[in-house]
Amino acid sequence: MAPASSNPGPYSLPDKDEVQLSAEDDWTRVKDRKEKKRIQNRVAQRSYRSRMKARLGELQSRLQAHEEQKAKEEAERCDPSPPSPPSSSATGLHLHTTPPSGNNAGANDTEPSSINSASPPTPPDVVGDLDPSQHAKAIDQFSHQMDMAGNDDSQWFLDSTSLLQHGDTSSYIQPSVPTPPVSLSQCPPMPAYMPEGPRNPNDGPASLSQSILQDCLRFQIQLLAKINNPSEATSTTHKEEGSAAKSPGALQQSHWSSCATNPAAAAQNMMPSTNMARGNSFSVLPADFHNLDDMMELTSTGDLPNATWRPSQQFSGPETTPRSHNAENPTQQQSPINDDTPSTTQHGAVPDCYNAFVAKSSAQASSLGMEERLEAAIEGLEALGFTSVDSFAEAYYSSSFDESSHLAAEQSMSRKRRLPRMLSQILDSAQSWDPWDRRGLNEEVLRTAESLLVAEGKSMDEKSLEASISGLMQATEGSSKPTPPQQNVTGMKRVLQNELPNLWPVMMALAGGNRASRQRDRSNMVLAAILILHCSSKMTKQKLLEFLDVCL
């Protein structure tokens, strides 16, 4: 049983003395260690979700209060009644905590040291038109409060590391609020402050709410990154502050252009995938392989050390096109913050977290050899759900696609042209393999050839063959010469070639190895062998011997 604490973590277990647990949630009755941890994980997750729902409800109510206050002030400005004395809320930004302390002191006089660790700092309430300097000052004060709360190990900021103490993360449900990455290298660069530019007077409460939520998400991510990696966070913060002091407008335009209209989608993009939580970096298939056949041919050859990396120009990360599209059409990507969907796009699209792998591959393009390229390709296929390269090739050639799609046309072209050439190169390369390695391949080739020849023999037109044999025998009996006319033998060979298009060339290849001086025409020997296979049970022994004597 987890020890009780006055300041529990995000995933701590509830106190049994304060909460009445059901029989199925009481882990003290279970003796098995794994089952006990499973129950504790379930109870901790349920407690965490309930706290987060309450927190989200509180934030939603506060946002609604901000919107109502803004609408009320706009209505008062439009009212021609005598102006009332300006209130303290209309002169600047107010910083307050939730729940409020007992006194009614001004929010601007709130000290960072007076923040209670049980209640998180909240973003400033923008209730008036302020210049950028005042807004930046308020934001810096709020950032300092966030740092103080982080040093006190506040329970309001998510930390995924404490969850790992209760078991495997694969069985956990994704929280309703996206968990920020544990390192600054996994999240996009963020400015130290974002000055508020001149707003359009026509902007309503919706844009105000998005701005508040945007600042809140940004400071939470920075604080978590600083807690998990203090050295990296300090160096990155200094760099960001210097760049923001030089050109804050450029930083705001470059990074927040797409997030300003859709903060919920931006928060979802920052959430790491399950593979990142397990410690596996996500990777994708390098685009240097122009098709599947090229990659399969490279895996079958032995010239891996001599090959070099050739980065393809057609590969580009998905950050440019989808994000610019989202900026133009923000309504198509709007989603609630408490959505439990994983951080992957629809229609089988690759998640955004593979940009790190793309950057790493591009940076090391000159030093990567063929083995590194193939390893990266295999890692990318495994990350996309394929167990191996073989399963990917099997799915590519055996799947049925829409006839109008580009993939169907590419698959058809590969089946007709590239697949036979690839199989031929693999079989040629197999001659240099170890005997135990190529044994299975040779056996499979023989089984395939056997089934193909058997099916061909069953589908042969026996009536046409019998008619040709009867005509040949009648011509032999009616002729004074011991051998039948040449045109009859040639006609029978043509019939067998049409009926047995695979067996005839195989028999011709086998007969080519026997170069006896008395056998001038190998086709006659092949004709006799095929007739023995297919006609030995349909004629008497005397007839068969006479026919063989005619052919040979």
Curated annotation (Swiss-Prot):
InterPro entries: bZIP_sf (IPR046347), Sec_Metab_Biosynth_Reg (IPR052635). Residues 64-79 have a biased composition (Basic and acidic residues). It comes from the Eukaryota. Residues 56-63 are annotated as: Leucine-zipper. Residues 98-119, 169-186, 298-347 have a biased composition (Polar residues). GO terms for cellular component: nucleus. Keywords: DNA-binding, Nucleus, Transcription, Transcription regulation. Residues 31-55 are annotated as: Basic motif. Belongs to the bZIP family. Transcription factor that regulates the expression of the gene cluster that mediates the biosynthesis of the lipopeptide antibiotics leucinostatins that show extensive biological activities, including antimalarial, antiviral, antibacterial, antifungal, and antitumor activities, as well as phytotoxic. All 20 genes in the cluster are up-regulated to some extent by lcsF, with the exception of lcsL and lcsP, which are down-regulated. This is Transcription factor lcsF. It comes from Purpureocillium lilacinum (Paecilomyces lilacinus).
